[in-house]
Amino acid sequence: MTAWPGHWARPTEGVRERLSVLQALLLDVDGVFTDGTVLRTEDGQEARRFSVVDGHGIGMLREAGVIVGVVSRENSAITRARMEKLQLDEIHIGATDKAAVMRDIVARRALNPAQVAFIGDDLPDLAAFDVAGVRIAPANAHPAVRETADLVLHCSGGHGAVREVCEVLLAARGEGPMANGF
């Protein structure tokens, strides 16, 4: 039996039950996949840092049949390239109305909102929370987002939050390396 890592959030029984029926995980990018930092070079190019550890977690979810996507206001070519490399099922970059995008995904994929989780870190993500069945926030999220979230992760965006949520979701479904730790 694998012990539950002390540095990861352990959901309450009610949240664990809701996580166990999820069919889709949708995520914001800046502040979730990244720490929100945008680097600029002398020639004006932008750069963002993504974690391969987070990417591996996404791969684990996809292998388990979970729909994975991003809904982000930031319209960044770097972000699009990274999400395409991860072969996400839904890529919505430059989304000005996150709730509308979420409702569209739910309808097109014939999902019930209770089957969808959203992880966001800042005030614009609260609209997406209104559509999601499970609302998740990284440790570094805005206080209002943490207060609204059903689950607040121990890891911060850009520093393992995505991997943590992937492992927690899989464990709640009885899958993945942490399944026996619940």
Label for each model-derived stretch:
Residues 44-51, 78, 84-86, 90-92, ...:
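Mg2+-dependent phosphoryl-transfer enzymes with acidic/Ser/Thr/Gly-rich catalytic loops
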Residues 58-82, 129:
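Substrate-recognition element of Asp-dependent hydrolases with the DxDx(T/V) motif
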